[in-house]
């Protein structure tokens, strides 16, 4: 009797949690409020760190700009969009943000694009 009560109670909890899940729609429809919009990023398997692609990102009706000296990848948005997720690319050019642009610093490292949900 106690076991069946626990199973029923567990099912009700799961049902209640699923019922409260909210679909936020597409990224374009989501209101990020004061936190800004997500930047496209690339990762590095050796350091397990991500860096933004470029330093300026369209956000709503304007643009969000990263702080100067932020490390970044000097990769065009079109190139980023065509990258295959989880494939390692060699010699991804590195730079630092300066006035909304990723300025090359003559260094490069291997990089990869995350899965689509990790944009």
Swiss-Prot record:
Asked if the Swiss-Prot or TrEMBL record annotates the protein with the keyword Signal, the reply is: yes
The record's subcellular locations are: Secreted
Q: Would the keyword Kinase turn up in this protein's UniProt record?
A: no
Q: Which GO terms describe its molecular function?
A: C-C chemokine binding
What are the glycosylated positions? 48, 67
* Cellular component annotations (GO), alphabetically ordered: extracellular region
Instruction: Provide the leader sequence positions.
Output: 1-21
Q: Which organism is it from?
A: Amblyomma cajennense
Q: Which domain of life is it from?
A: Eukaryota
This protein is called: Evasin P983
Please list the disulfide bridges.
Answer: 37-59, 55-97, 72-102, 92-111
Matching InterPro entries: EVA_Class_A
User: Which keywords describe this protein according to UniProt?
Assistant: Disulfide bond, Glycoprotein, Secreted, Signal
Q: What does this protein do?
A: Salivary chemokine-binding protein which binds to host chemokines CCL2, CCL3 and CCL8.
């Amino acid at each position: 009797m106690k076991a069946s009560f626990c199973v029923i109670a567990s099912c009700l909890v799961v049902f209640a949690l699923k019922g409260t899940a909210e679909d936020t729609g597409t990224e374009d429809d989501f209101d990020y409020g004061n936190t800004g919009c997500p930047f496209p990023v690339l990762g590095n398997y050796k350091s397990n760190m991500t860096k933004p692609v470029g330093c300026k990102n369209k956000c709503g009706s304007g643009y969000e700009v990263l702080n100067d000296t932020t490390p970044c990848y000097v990769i065009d948005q079109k190139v980023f969009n065509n990258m295959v997720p989880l494939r390692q690319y060699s010699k991804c050019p590195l730079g630092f943000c300066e006035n909304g642009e990723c300025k090359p610093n003559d260094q490069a490292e291997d990089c990869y694009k995350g899965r689509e949900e990790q944009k």
